[in-house]
């Protein structure tokens, strides 16, 4: 099943992080996302370019609405013509399948609004 068609599952502190094999399976479905480590926590991160601040804010709101609907929330940095989105699972201080699902959903929103 395509990641954009999946739903986030409730995540508890004892939930397993995605392993190397699962990352190898999931990451090709969101190739524009980088896996970065910040303060010892792996995250999915992508910078989106938009035409101006108004479009950046609108994109931020759309991502926020999807995050609320799924109960899984990113870090968002909105600037003129740019939005940086970071997904990771706070409860496990690492990456969970939910992060890959939400990255794919973020890509779908970006495609709808013309963000690159």
UniProtKB/Swiss-Prot annotation:
Transmembrane segments: none annotated. Keywords: Lyase. This is Putative pterin-4-alpha-carbinolamine dehydratase 1. It is an enzyme of class 4 (lyase). PANTHER family: PTERIN-4-ALPHA-CARBINOLAMINE DEHYDRATASE-RELATED. Its EC number is 4.2.1.96. Coiled coil: none annotated. One of its GO terms (biological process) is tetrahydrobiopterin biosynthetic process. It catalyses: (4aS,6R)-4a-hydroxy-L-erythro-5,6,7,8-tetrahydrobiopterin = (6R)-L-erythro-6,7-dihydrobiopterin + H2O. One of its GO terms (molecular function) is 4-alpha-hydroxytetrahydrobiopterin dehydratase activity.
């Amino acid at each position: 099943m395509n990641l954009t068609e999946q739903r986030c599952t409730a995540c508890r502190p004892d939930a397993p992080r995605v392993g190397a094999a699962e990352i190898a399976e999931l990451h090709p479905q969101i190739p524009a996302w980088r896996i970065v480590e910040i303060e010892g926590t792996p995250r999915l991160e992508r910078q989106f370019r938009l035409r101006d601040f108004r479009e950046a804010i609108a994109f931020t709101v759309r991502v926020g609405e999807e995050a609320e609907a799924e109960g899984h929330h990113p870090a968002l940095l909105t600037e003129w013509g740019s939005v940086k989105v970071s997904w990771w699972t706070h409860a496990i201080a690492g990456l969970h399948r939910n992060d890959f699902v939400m990255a794919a959903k973020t890509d779908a929103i970006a495609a709808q609004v013309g963000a690159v």
